[in-house]
Amino acid sequence: MTTYTNADLHCHSVVSDGTLEPEALAARAKANGVELWALTDHDEVGGQQRAAAAARAQGMAYLTGAEISVTFAGTTVHIVGLGFDAQDERLLQGLARTRGGRGERAQEMAEQLAKVGIPGAYEGALHYVGNPELISRTHFARYLVEAGVCKDTSEVFRKFLIEGKPGFVPHRWASLGDAVRWIQDAGGVAVIAHPARYRLSANEEFALFSEFKQHGGQGVEVVTGSHSAAEAVSYAAMAQEFGFAASRGSDFHSPDESHTDLGMLPPLPGHLTPVWDLLAHRIQPAH
């Protein structure tokens, strides 16, 4: 079994809410020493063929990927699927249903922002959208920075785009069980993405991990761009407690916005099973 010292299994391209094309991401990953890579666009696999070809051209091994938005106990949680068949019909249908409604939500967001003195946000956000089916809060955030409303996208989210703020509009995503089933039925492994981001209570987090495991989930992101060193230690312990494999991914979106660049992450703790060990038969070789 091949050992990878630098795997990055979580990032986004212009196909969803990143700013780089899949080929540019692959080149950046290679330049940063990545050996095993996955493109994980939100609720979409349209960039997979390009990403796999770019990985081969750069001499990197590749796993298919997607980040699926789910609703759990009233909270939006992200599940990364890895190593699946990107042409699986049930997966494609499920992702299409999950993408549905984003346009209507975006119109509502723009209406709410107009009420607080920010007109034209929908049209502005569209300038940043690579895939019209995947217009998101991030695209609105980029426009509001361009318009001078806020200094950076983090400030936009804090002031306008999180729950309780004027531009937030909820959306009903897939269920946790649906997302895991789509991934597994397509031959992949489901992973809880950046669990510290959800700010769940200890009881809520235990419930999420328990239900995820009951549905057949097999992994958790232990090392990721938004986790502190202490959080990585905490989720390493939870991975052991639940018998999960550990994943590693930067969640890179843009050179101008992301705190962690592709591949520039601490290593996984050595006592954990890397998620790619579960997917050795699904890894597309570097050459």
Go through the PLM ranges and name each one.
Residues 1-75, 161-162, 174-175, 180-182, ...:
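An N-terminally biased module of ancient metal coordination in phosphate/nucleic-acid-related enzymes
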Residues 4-6, 93-96, 240-242, 267-270:
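A general, composition-driven signal for non-globular sequence regions
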Residues 20, 127, 158, 259-261:
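Residue-level detector of alpha-helical segments with a strong bias toward transmembrane helices
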Residues 54-210, 271-287:
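Extended substrate/RNA-proximal surfaces in nucleic-acid metabolism proteins
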Residues 229, 250-287:
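Catalytic core of soluble alpha/beta enzymes
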